[in-house]
Amino acid sequence: MPAKPRHSAWFQSLANPSERYGLDEIVYTDRNGGLLQVVHDMEALKRTSGNRWKELFESRQHKSEWPYGSGVWGKKEWVLPELEPDNVVSMYEGHTNLFWADRYGRELGLEDLWLKLCGNTHTGSFKDLGMTVLVSMVKEMRARGKAVRAVGCASTGDTSAALAAYAAAAAIPAIVFLPRGKISIAQLIQPVANGAIVFALDTDFDGCMEIVKQIADKDGIYLANSMNSLRIEGQKTVGIEIVQQFDWEVPDWIIIPGGNLGNVSALAKGLDMLVELGLVTRRPRIVCAQAQNANPLYRAYKRGFESFEPIAALPTLASAIQIGNPVSYVKAIDAIKRYDGIVEEASESELAEAAARADRTGLFNCPHTGVALAAMEKLVANGTIKKSDRVVVVSTAHGLKFIDFKLKYHEMRIEGVESYFPNPPIELAAKYPLVRDAMLREIERRFGKHAA
């Protein structure tokens, strides 16, 4: 028989460290309804030096040995160390590229701007990083005889796509609850295509979340939202991966959009492990960017985190973060405090214009990335972010999931947004003189009279 792993992890109450559960137990909160976190045996992990961890992670990168070629499972000892490899459900997620935004950065006065393109993955968003972990654990639970009938989630689009795909790969039934008419067609069709049971409910995300929590509590459906801390274990690898891609050098800033706030919490957790296990010695500053129409964390930040109050989120172009009562606010506040962090907001106009401005330099941004870019632009303008700082913006989803947003922007049909960078197609008769004149006129207008 193979030797058992030397490393271990468990669920632990945030409020009461003595309250623990096994990762294969069906539990989402502590006895008082508070959040759980996955805690690792750090003393066991520290028996391996920081340099040895670097060597191990580098040796697995982009390799085909199962399951270590995945950006998540290449760090298995830090994620789910005791999971049987045969129960891993992976689509080789992670390893998404860092885009050096040279032209966009120069336009803003930044010398070292990068975007972490988490949308360049199987279902088009960072949610794959967490869902591979959760669905793998569910597969193992079912193999052990646990009574898990199906997995379910409330979603504003990206979570449902990831859950449906990974559950389909594992032959596990998936049930998703979406706010009717509030997500893009591309986001809706993904769980439909992957065979999930899809409910479109006449409510917002928070209303869908209340329904799925009741179903998880009463009907044997395993909850896959980010209040389930297993998701955080996969999502935390984005911070680790960013540092690894910079040859283990820590950037000055990491800017990330926030809705349900699991992602900013996960980012900090991954960075914490890098420091505690000796791979790096410094921390970046973290910025959490929220849409102005769904900004409870920003409001709490402006009050010095004296209190946190849920709000009724208003409609926003950044539909995936239209969340007024985020589950992970306690973890997010802790992360912001410990990382000398900032919470910034972006109006609908600011997020749309920032996304379009960056698109003109070769990117293709989702509206949520637009929120992060707009926050960054504000911090550059007020001098908080300096010219020479190395800045990484986490782009959370692929722009192709939001083509309606793109089309309406360029057709100047978004209410309250002026569209400073519209680029609608030029419709002409198919006659060479007309086409030539229009082409030369546009080249001169856009690039100057002496454009090469």
Question: PLM features: what roles do these ranges have?
Answer:
Residues 1-452:
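PLP-dependent amino-acid enzyme catalytic core
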